[in-house]
């Protein structure tokens, strides 16, 4: 069977490269690149995306073999009806492998048409590595790679103020645009780049905070043979996502003219303050995802839908949202939003594997759940027991688990703690909670948290997750 490429797709169009995208994963292709495809179809945007993979090169190779084309399935409720549709996305021009073709990356920096830079490198992506150097090919971190790219552009156009870029990071961290700009400026200082470059970053470039919302499980592993037979071509880059989506960009109004989302009928907003959008989405949807994942995986479940429809795990998740997340937010319309989120989790078309949510789970908990835990404890004078139970499950999940995908330093830390403390759950809890590099603070200072985590670690270890959760639910969190 022939593989999808421009020879198979009769409507293939080559657009000018206006966007550099860091990340080639399922989410960006099922969310951002789909929207760019919509802009090309319904407006005069006339632009494509050049993709850089932050790590490795295998998917870049597959992208180029398919001429940037891939099939997107959108499944779920649309305008009140269940809709399962698919389309070929024609917005990616090429993938650039930084490890084998760095010169192509440098060359793109001098493109007259390039205007936008978009990224999604997970919550752990916007960081600085003091060992990165401008001379590296490439740098280790995403911001290091980006700083080098912007410096190449600054040099190519001799500091021309009209050749700056609009940068829209999609990483789920607070003030992601501001954090990215700060990290770029840190690299500029670290590398002792001239003051003119720093001034150009400030004056010629626009860094936008943004918030993304769409569940994109990715490649349909379980049904790929049936799908391939129906499509009539082989596609190694199929993406499955839900119908619902929302993109909120905090930035000046003129961005909506350069990226004409409204004219394309897209549900993307340009706003002056995305804080309420972000807080609601990150705390409830992403927070529920991260809280359920270690509990459900240790229980033996595989998908988000399995978890929310399970009698005990589903009840645990619902009560965690209603009794611990919503009360600290103090915003209108939260109950309806929470109901909508749980209905999205139950989407019968979507198989969202919990293992995919477990990627970089420690940094995700810090961003999505730790603020709720702290605020609940401060406001109520007691601990949010379900969230603490989930936190304990997360720490136990990092015990002797070879399937974990996280920063090597994080994995090494947990390996050492679990090995050195030899099952002493109180000492394990104390060491992990005290590791400020993970949490940005010493969590042992939260009253009673260390002891409570140790209690739950003991129960999960001795009873297994099924019995531990059963006892927890029966006794309302008063397990001793």
From Swiss-Prot:
Stored Pfam families: Mannitol_dh (PF01232), Mannitol_dh_C (PF08125)
Induction / repression: Induced by galacturonate, repressed by glucose.
GO annotation, cellular component aspect: cytosol
GO biological process: D-galacturonate catabolic process; mannitol catabolic process
EC numbers, comma separated: 1.1.1.58
InterPro entries given in the database record: 6-PGluconate_DH-like_C_sf, 6PGD_dom2, Altronate_OxRdtase, Mannitol_DH, Mannitol_DH_C, Mannitol_DH_N, NAD(P)-bd_dom_sf
Class of the enzyme per the UniProt entry, highest EC level: oxidoreductase
Example of a GO MF term: mannitol-1-phosphate 5-dehydrogenase activity
Residues noted as binding NAD(+) in the record, renumbered to the chain: 19-30
Substrates-to-products reaction catalysed: D-altronate + NAD(+) = keto-D-tagaturonate + NADH + H(+)
Pathway field: Carbohydrate metabolism; pentose and glucuronate interconversion
Keyword Oxidoreductase included in the entry's annotation: yes
Additional notes on this entry: Member of the exu locus which is required for galacturonate utilization.
Family stated for the protein in its record: Belongs to the mannitol dehydrogenase family. UxaB subfamily.
Protein name: Altronate oxidoreductase
The species this protein was found in: Bacillus subtilis (strain 168)
């Amino acid at each position: 069977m022939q593989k999808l490429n421009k020879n198979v797709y009769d409507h293939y169009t080559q657009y000018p490269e206006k966007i550099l995208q860091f990340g080639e994963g399922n989410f960006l292709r099922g969310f951002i690149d789909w929207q760019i495809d919509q802009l090309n179809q319904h407006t005069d945007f006339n632009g494509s995306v050049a993709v850089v993979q932050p790590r490795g090169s295998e998917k870049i190779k597959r992208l180029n073999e398919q001429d940037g084309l891939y099939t997107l399935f959108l499944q779920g409720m649309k305008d009140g009806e269940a809709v399962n549709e698919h389309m070929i996305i024609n917005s990616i021009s090429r993938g650039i492998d930084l490890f084998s073709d760095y010169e192509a990356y440098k060359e793109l920096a001098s493109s007259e048409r390039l205007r936008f830079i978009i990224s999604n490198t997970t919550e752990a992506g916007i960081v600085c590595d003091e060992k990165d150097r401008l001379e590296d090919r490439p740098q280790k971190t995403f911001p290091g790679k980006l700083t080098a790219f912007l410096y190449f552009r600054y040099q190519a156009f001799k500091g021309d103020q009209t050749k700056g870029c609009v940068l829209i990071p999609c990483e789920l961290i607070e003030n992601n645009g501001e954090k990215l700009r700060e990290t770029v400026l840190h690299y500029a200082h670290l590398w002792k780049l001239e003051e003119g470059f720093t001034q150009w970053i400030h004056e010629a470039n626009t860094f936008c905070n943004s918030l993304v919302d769409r569940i994109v499980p990715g490649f349909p592993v379980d049904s790929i043979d049936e799908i391939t037979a129906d499509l009539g071509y082989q596609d190694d880059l199929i993406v499955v996502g839900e119908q619902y989506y929302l993109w909120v960009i905090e930035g000046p109004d003129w961005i909506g003219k350069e990226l004409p989302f409204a004219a394309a009928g897209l549900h993307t907003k340009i706003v002056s303050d995305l804080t309420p959008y972000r807080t609601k989405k990150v705390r409830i949807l992403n927070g529920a995802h991260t809280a359920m994942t270690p509990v459900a995986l240790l229980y033996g479940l595989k998908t988000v839908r399995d978890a929310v429809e399970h009698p005990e795990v589903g009840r645990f998740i619902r009560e965690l949202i209603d009794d611990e997340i919503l009360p600290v937010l103090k915003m209108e319309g939260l109950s309806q939003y929470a109901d909508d989120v749980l209905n999205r989790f139950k989407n019968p078309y979507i198989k969202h594997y919990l293992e995919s949510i477990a990627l970089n789970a420690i940094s995700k908990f810090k961003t999505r759940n730790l603020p709720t835990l702290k605020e609940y404890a401060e406001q109520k004078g007691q601990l949010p027991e379900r969230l603490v139970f989930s936190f304990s499950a997360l720490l136990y999940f990092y015990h002797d688990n070879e399937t974990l995908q996280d920063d090597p330093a994080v994995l090494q830390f947990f390996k050492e703690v679990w090995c050195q403390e030899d099952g002493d759950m109180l000492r394990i809890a104390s060491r992990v909670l005290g590791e400020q590099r993970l949490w940005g603070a010493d969590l042992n200072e939260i009253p009673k948290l260390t002891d409570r985590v140790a209690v739950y670690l003991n129960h999960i270890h001795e009873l297994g997750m099924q019995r531990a959760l059963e006892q927890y639910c029966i006794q309302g969190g008063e397990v001793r």
